[in-house]
Design a protein with these regions (language model features):
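Catalytic core of PPM/PP2C metal-dependent serine/threonine phosphatase domains
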Residues: 56-110, 181-199
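PP2C/PPM family metal-dependent serine/threonine protein phosphatase catalytic domain
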Residues: 2-15, 72-81, 103-132, 174-185
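Hydrophobic residues embedded in beta-strands of well-ordered beta-sheets
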Residues: 31-33, 96-98, 106-107, 115-116, ...
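C-terminal catalytic subdomain
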Residues: 2-9, 132-133, 145-219
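Conserved beta-strand-loop-short alpha-helix elements that form
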Residues: 8-9, 22-44, 101, 130-155, ...
Length: 219
């Protein structure tokens, strides 16, 4: 399973939102991987990113561990984070996904269940499961969601994304997030950012045997 990704953050003289997005192809494991984190604390964001890197470099627990065991492991790690912190993260390994959020950062999107796709917003969750092609995952701060939830839901609806090349879909999603960011800013939104991930089936983003890495982070 491949992934279309896009991100947005409000450019500020003194950054208050930090994002990280990486997309890779592991030839040996034959796995497509995407992970992203968002926080208003740069040190915490780097800490979460390092924990995910450790997960990817260790034994392939994503195939040998049960979903409940992975969830318990990550819940324990997140319990050590300051209770007043704001963060959200996602790790997609093919169709398997880890999702977590806390405080002023939100986890939301379109999730397929029982043949139906609906918009959901979670708070303070740590979940592990399988995602189907067309599931749309969004990590965003509360302000962006508060000012533009209806518009975000509309542009991220799977059928609104199109069926053309994955790179074109990603570019279009990037532009749309930027448009909504400007709209939220005009409405008074501050310190905003979002990462969007759409697992899809179909053509590969990378040519055969090639690995791709992308990192997007405010400075």
């Amino acid at each position: 399973m491949e992934h279309v990704t896009a991100c947005y953050w409000q450019k500020e003289t003194v950054p208050n939102i930090f994002l990280s997005l990486q997309q890779r192809k592991y030839r040996r494991r034959k796995a497509s991987v995407v992970y992203a984190c968002i926080s208003d604390n740069r040190e915490l964001l780097m800490n979460l990113q390092n924990k995910i890197e450790e997960e990817l470099q260790g034994r392939d627990i994503w195939k040998s561990y049960t979903e409940e065991r992975i969830r318990e492991k990550w819940s324990k790690q997140l319990e050590a984070v300051d209770k007043n912190s704001n963060y959200a993260g996602v790790l997609c390994v093919d169709s398997r996904v880890l999702l977590f959020d806390h405080g002023g950062m939100n986890l939301c999107g379109f999730f397929k269940r029982f043949g139906r796709t609906g918009w959901k917003v979670w708070k303070d969750q740590c979940m592990v499961g399988e995602v189907e092609a067309g599931t749309a995952i969004l990590l965003t701060d509360h302000g962006f969601l508060n000012y533009c939830e209806e518009e975000l839901a509309g542009c991220l609806r799977p059928e609104s994304v199109g069926t053309d090349l994955l790179s074109d879909r990603a570019e279009r999603a990037e532009r749309r997030l930027a448009e909504l960011g400007r709209k939220a800013e005009q409405r008074g939104g501050r310190h905003m950012g979002a990462v969007w991930i759409l697992p899809v089936k179909g053509e590969a983003i990378w040519s055969k045997g090639k690995q791709s890495n992308e990192t997007v982070q405010t400075e």
